[in-house]
């Protein structure tokens, strides 16, 4: 008798997606970060749901309500620490997931990749509006600086900023709508996750070689499901250790003070996972140019499938492209460092050089390296063919 999981309409979807899913036998632990992202998203939604029960999205009470959660609510301190540090863990997994996709050529699955980039943008938006909710000093001034960038839009910029603010400055209306956005966007992200998986299962997973592996696929369960469970345990251990022993290591000290519009922090900066984009924004002296560079730094990821020039999908057998890839990773690390530094020499010039390098590497050097490798491959094939003919004759 056929198992119910293969015949029942709902169970069949689960079976085809997580149990009998044909999976390349040679995928590594780097393919684990997709499932870890799903776990992180669920943790964020659950902890956020319980925090929302006690949070007050009112300017006069929001900071006090966060203090109340930490001090008076049972295990509120643990919920808050888990939610705040869970965002950092989520973005670490996100960057590793995207880096693996770029390294092994998964970005050539265009629908899957572009939906992933949209999800990345939504998560950035969710994290930004969430950073405003505690209504600390950095929350207020970060919201003021970042939302004020919309004023760079020609003609309608001023009206657009006031529409987002709900008034003439970041105020009670801004906080209320940011809370509504922060609560809603994760559920939209869950919907996009379903689409992401749908398109992924249409093409099948990529593998480290970048070659087709139809003859060599095995069921996802139990071979990879248990490996995912191990990843879950390691992630939960890391998140719990962070929440218990160093909950404030990734947060800004200024945010422990209640928001005061009369006192400007010495150095306004977003959370660490946005610093590379913030550095690109600051590196352009013109406001409109900075906003355009910031938008392009994300949109450039959507262009990658269209400028792939190599005949090979993965970087596994492409040493020159590997060099460019790791230069790109180092460049993002430098931008992250610069984004956390004050706007003064020598950080200004380093930020500008790193910002130009970011776009040069991703939009020029990556396609050029692929084209050059194709030429070298053709030369090598021609030489081998000549040697073969000479040996035969």
From Swiss-Prot:
Binding site for heme b b562: 83, 182
GO biological process: mitochondrial electron transport, ubiquinol to cytochrome c
UniProt keyword Transport present: yes
Needed cofactors: heme b
Keywords, sorted A to Z: Electron transport, Heme, Iron, Membrane, Metal-binding, Mitochondrion, Mitochondrion inner membrane, Respiratory chain, Transmembrane, Transmembrane helix, Transport, Ubiquinone
Residue spans crossing the bilayer: 33-53, 77-98, 113-133, 178-198, 226-246, 288-308, 320-340, 347-367
Protein localization: Mitochondrion inner membrane
Residues the record lists as binding a ubiquinone: 201
Annotated PROSITE patterns: CYTB_CTER, CYTB_NTER
Residue numbers binding heme b b566: 97, 196
Presence of keyword Mitochondrion: yes
Other known facts: Heme 1 (or BL or b562) is low-potential and absorbs at about 562 nm, and heme 2 (or BH or b566) is high-potential and absorbs at about 566 nm.
Stated role: Component of the ubiquinol-cytochrome c reductase complex (complex III or cytochrome b-c1 complex) that is part of the mitochondrial respiratory chain. The b-c1 complex mediates electron transfer from ubiquinol to cytochrome c. Contributes to the generation of a proton gradient across the mitochondrial membrane that is then used for ATP synthesis.
Protein name, UniProt field: Cytochrome b
């Amino acid at each position: 008798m056929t198992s119910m999981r293969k015949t029942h309409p709902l169970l069949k979807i689960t079976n085809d997606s997580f149990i009998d899913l044909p999976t390349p036998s040679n995928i590594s632990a780097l393919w684990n970060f997709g499932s870890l992202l799903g776990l992180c998203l669920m943790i964020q939604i659950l902890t956020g749901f319980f925090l929302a029960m006690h949070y007050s999205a009112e300017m006069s009470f929001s900071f006090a309500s966060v203090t109340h959660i930490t001090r008076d609510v049972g295990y509120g301190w643990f919920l808050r620490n888990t939610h705040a540090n869970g965002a950092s863990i989520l973005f670490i997994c996100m960057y590793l997931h995207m880096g693996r996709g770029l390294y092994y050529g998964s970005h050539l699955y265009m629908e899957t990749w572009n939906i992933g980039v949209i999800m990345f943008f939504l998560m950035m938006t969710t994290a930004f509006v969430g950073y405003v909710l505690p209504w600390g000093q950095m929350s207020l001034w970060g919201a003021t600086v970042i939302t004020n960038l919309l004023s760079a839009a020609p003609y309608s910029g001023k009206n657009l900023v006031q529409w987002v603010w709900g008034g003439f400055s970041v105020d009670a209306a801004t906080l209320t709508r940011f809370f509504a956005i922060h609560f809603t966007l994760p559920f939209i992200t869950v919907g996009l996750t379903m689409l992401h998986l749908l398109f992924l299962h249409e093409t099948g997973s990529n593998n480290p070689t970048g070659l087709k592996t139809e003859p060599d696929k095995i069921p996802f369960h139990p071979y990879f499901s248990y490996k995912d469970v191990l990843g879950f345990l390691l992630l939960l251990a890391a998140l719990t250790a962070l929440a218990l022993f160093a909950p404030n290591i990734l947060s800004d000290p200024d945010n422990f003070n209640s928001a005061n519009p009369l006192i400007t922090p010495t150095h306004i900066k977003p959370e660490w996972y946005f610093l590379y984009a913030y550095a690109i924004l600051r590196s352009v002296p013109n406001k409109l140019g900075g906003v355009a560079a910031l938008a392009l730094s994300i949109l450039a990821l959507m262009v990658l499938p269209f400028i792939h020039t190599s005949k090979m999908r993965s970087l596994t057998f492409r040493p020159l492209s590997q060099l460019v890839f790791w230069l790109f990773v180092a460049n993002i690390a430098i931008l992250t460092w610069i984004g956390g530094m004050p706007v003064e020499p020598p950080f200004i010039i380093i930020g500008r050089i790193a910002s130009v390098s970011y776009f040069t590497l991703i939009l020029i050097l990556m396609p050029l390296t692929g084209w050059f490798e194709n030429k070298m491959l053709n030369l090598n094939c021609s030489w081998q063919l000549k040697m073969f003919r000479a040996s035969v004759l």
